[in-house]
Amino acid sequence: MKEDPRHIRISEFNYPLPDERIAKFPLSVRDQSKLLLYRHGEVSEDRFTSLPEYLPSGSLMIFNNTKVIQARLHFRKETGALIEVFCLEPIQPNDYALNFQQTEHAAWLCMVGNLKKWKEGMLRREMTVKGKSLTLTAERGECHGTSHWINFRWNNPEVTFADILEVFGELPIPPSLNRETQESDKETYQTVYSKIKGSVAAPTAGLHFTPRVLDALRNKGVELEELTLHVGAGTFKPVKSEEIEGHEMHTEYISVSRNTLEKLIVHGGKAVAVGTTSVRTLESLYHIGVTLLNNPEATEEDLHVHQWQPYEMSAKATATSAVEALQAIVAYLDRHSMEALHTSTQIIIAPGYEYKIVKAMVTNFHQPQSTLLLLVSAFVHGDWPKIYNYALAHDFRFLSYGDSSLLIP
């Protein structure tokens, strides 16, 4: 890595974003959004449906197939106080798929809204799920920073926790939309290829893709592969410290199949990433591979990518090629008879970071002074003001439901 970004001042990544430029709702047809093109320093625009024209045949495009869960649960106390319990990540069991299949009991790490009104006792809610009446209770456990361990119990063994979220939960939409969740968000705030439940926010770069765009990409000779990163609520956490050294990145869980890893190797360790979540996962793979090359006996816990890990690598480690790093992960899967890598990442990508795998990215327009803007700036070598000034001057819509960009540095 060339330089340590810890002393970057977040105020250098500010720009004026009028409220009317924030898209509160998506377009009625997903792929009719505008597409800003940044190619080797030049900026132009097109429609998202034209995306395949700008990617060479033989490219490998990687998508995040996570699915947003209806993670917000509302309870009303006997006093009338409304308490919101926002499920962040599974605790018992800590595997997402197993937790969703739990009957009668599940525990999650949650944020609690109106916590001061819930000092003791259990929250209760009567409901009907799949034609069956039941009572759901929520009990507060230990505190973890700004979150709490919450034990959920319900009195019907035929109903899973996934069933309860589906009926009782509300889809969490970004705070920047400044509105209530609507029924239409259940469809529009999911990508058309979402599969694996676990996110509390959508990987929004993927919202523009439709079956016809995906078909056009395949017809162009672009290979499409998937990985999973469950997006946490920390993605909306503002940077409050003057220097980014004071900002703690959230941990997010990732899963990458052997097939996707092998495709990346065939493509020389180069990929087009759809969204910043795919970017963070792909770049984390490089650092996981380097860890395994240095310590082949590393455990699953050892593979977690720490926030500043990329900037603390030796010169020898940074000379490792992407293919060598990916081959080390496949060898790890072979040793453990596994078909997928399951681990977590806390990586922060900021100016000074040297991209190893991602050669082009599709992404929306991000909040001022956000870690996602730092990620984009690192990718385009500091040229982000040119991109954002163009978008502001040419009527692009911003943030989660806004327009798209294809960045090729």
Which residues does each predicted region cover?
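Surface-exposed, charge/polar-rich loops and edge strands
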Residues: 1-409
